[in-house]
UniProtKB/Swiss-Prot annotation:
InterPro entries named in the record: Ribosomal_uS2, Ribosomal_uS2_bac/mit/plastid, Ribosomal_uS2_CS, Ribosomal_uS2_flav_dom_sf
A GO cellular component annotation in the UniProt record: cytosolic small ribosomal subunit
Entry's family note: Belongs to the universal ribosomal protein uS2 family.
Protein name (record): Small ribosomal subunit protein uS2
Gene name of this polypeptide: rpsB
Cysteines joined through disulfide linkages: none
Superkingdom to which the source organism belongs: Bacteria
Coiled coil ranges: none
GO molecular function annotations of the record: structural constituent of ribosome
Keyword terms: Ribonucleoprotein, Ribosomal protein
Organism (species): Ruegeria sp. (strain TM1040)
Entry keyword Ribonucleoprotein: yes
């Protein structure tokens, strides 16, 4: 099983090594800090590289065993890359706002997900029998629920691993995962504490390029795990890729 490859140069170009201002540091991150430059802490990338590799291995192995990964990143610059990476790798995400109890009170959350599915079905059927006011109210509910729960609507239960951008902002998500014994992979900046994180990735959690790089690598690791899972089940991945073309030809022949 091949892991996605990355180089220290890629990390440098993405600004992964830039921490926060030295006065805003968290002493718990001191083992991962190389030094300071112009009042900014610089991360020790010779540690980040192997730790990122370990994190990607954990993600790949989780998916290879049929596990689900939940991507969590609700800050503005993380929202889009988090959703794209999760969708690309057939995983799940929360990028709007972490709802308290998402993991620890899954039963209640799943009721809200069922409500979203019911609304979607009703709207798809044309919302028959509703007044204009009722329809507008339903559309508003649909938008709210989709923003909050759209990324986990098909998760079907609590995830097997969390991937988090910004441990300070997502402290509640990490606390819930810790309570349930769900492993956490997270990018930890110099102003944060690594406590509660099983697989620490010491790095910048604000720069758009850095966030995109983490998300891309994690998505690729999940896809590697998926191909390993399918391979172990005896599925011919080459045949899967060719199937849609063959089906299209068969359909054309049937219609001729």
């Amino acid at each position: 099983m091949a892991l996605p490859e990355f180089t220290m140069r890629q990390l440098l170009e993405a600004g992964v090594h830039f921490g926060h201002q030295t006065q805003r540091w968290n002493p718990r991150m001191s083992p991962f800090i190389y030094g300071a430059r112009n009042g900014i802490h610089i991360m020790d990338l010779t540690q980040t590289v192997p730790m990122l590799d370990q994190a990607l291995t954990a993600i790949r192995d989780t998916v290879a065993k049929g596990g689900r990964v939940l991507f969590v990143g609700t800050k503005r610059q993380a929202a889009a890359p988090i959703a794209e990476a999760a969708e690309k790798s057939a995983q799940y995400y929360m990028n709007h706002r972490w709802l308290g109890g998402t993991l620890t009170n899954w039963k209640t959350v799943s009721q809200s997900i069922n409500r979203l599915k019911e609304i979607d079905e009703r709207m798809a059927a044309g919302a028959e029998g509703l007044t204009k006011k009722e329809r507008l109210g339903m559309e508003r509910d649909q938008e709210k629920l989709q923003a909050s729960l759209g990324g986990i609507r098909d998760m079907g239960g609590v995830p097997d691993l969390l991937f988090v951008i910004d441990v300070k902002k997502e402290a509640l998500a990490i606390a819930e995962a810790n309570k349930l014994g769900i492993p956490v992979v997270a990018v930890v900046d110099t102003n944060c504490s690594p406590d509660g994180v099983d697989y620490i990735i010491p790095g910048n959690d604000d720069a758009a390029r850095a966030i995109s790089l983490y998300c891309d690598l994690v998505a690729r690791a999940a896809l590697d795990g998926m191909s390993a899972q399918l391979g172990a089940a005896g599925v011919d991945l080459g045949a899967l890729e060719e199937a849609p073309v063959e089906e299209a030809v068969a359909e054309e022949a049937a219609g001729a």
